[in-house]
Amino acid sequence: MSIIKEFKEFAVKGNVMDLAVGVIIGGAFSKIVDSVVKDLIMPVIGVLTGGLDFSNKFVLLGTIPPSFKGNPDSFKDLQAAGVAAFGYGSFITVAINFVILAFIIFLMVKFINKLRKPEEAAPAATPEDIVLLREIRDSLKQR
């Protein structure tokens, strides 16, 4: 019975609940960032680079089998057929997703830190030499 009680206390603590909410919101936010990159940023980059589509950029590492019936210029078709290919275009897209997500999280943390009240610093401890001088002064006053 004590294990169940301990688990309840652990699960209901603020940190665990905050983490759960953060993971859920993070998952939803990740989808928004993916859409922004895929649907808004990458098409603009494609136009600026003359119609370059990063999602389909790859380097063929193996040979295409004669029985291959898909499009040899399609990374997804080659992957589905088991052909070895290095998909650097997908990596570029994911890297852009990461940079955008990291920047947005940085801005959020910066904003939250601004909202927090600065903690008052504890008064600095009196240096030992000052304490000693005060003791000497007090001792001399008593004489």
Swiss-Prot record:
<keyword id="KW-0407">Ion channel</keyword>
<keyword id="KW-1003">Cell membrane</keyword>
<comment type="similarity">
    <text>Belongs to the MscL family.</text>
</comment>
<dbReference type="GO" id="GO:0005886">
    <property type="term" value="C:plasma membrane"/>
</dbReference>
<comment type="subunit">
    <text>Homopentamer.</text>
</comment>
<keyword id="KW-1133">Transmembrane helix</keyword>
<protein>
    <recommendedName>
        <fullName>Large-conductance mechanosensitive channel</fullName>
    </recommendedName>
</protein>
<dbReference type="GO" id="GO:0008381">
    <property type="term" value="F:mechanosensitive monoatomic ion channel activity"/>
</dbReference>
<dbReference type="InterPro" id="IPR019823">
    <property type="entry name" value="Mechanosensitive_channel_CS"/>
</dbReference>
<feature type="transmembrane region" description="Helical">
    <location>
        <begin position="10"/>
        <end position="30"/>
    </location>
</feature>
<keyword id="KW-0406">Ion transport</keyword>
<dbReference type="InterPro" id="IPR037673">
    <property type="entry name" value="MSC/AndL"/>
</dbReference>
<dbReference type="InterPro" id="IPR036019">
    <property type="entry name" value="MscL_channel"/>
</dbReference>
<keyword id="KW-0813">Transport</keyword>
<comment type="function">
    <text>Channel that opens in response to stretch forces in the membrane lipid bilayer. May participate in the regulation of osmotic pressure changes within the cell.</text>
</comment>
<feature type="transmembrane region" description="Helical">
    <location>
        <begin position="89"/>
        <end position="109"/>
    </location>
</feature>
<keyword id="KW-0997">Cell inner membrane</keyword>
<keyword id="KW-0812">Transmembrane</keyword>
<dbReference type="InterPro" id="IPR001185">
    <property type="entry name" value="MS_channel"/>
</dbReference>
<keyword id="KW-0472">Membrane</keyword>
<dbReference type="Pfam" id="PF01741">
    <property type="entry name" value="MscL"/>
</dbReference>
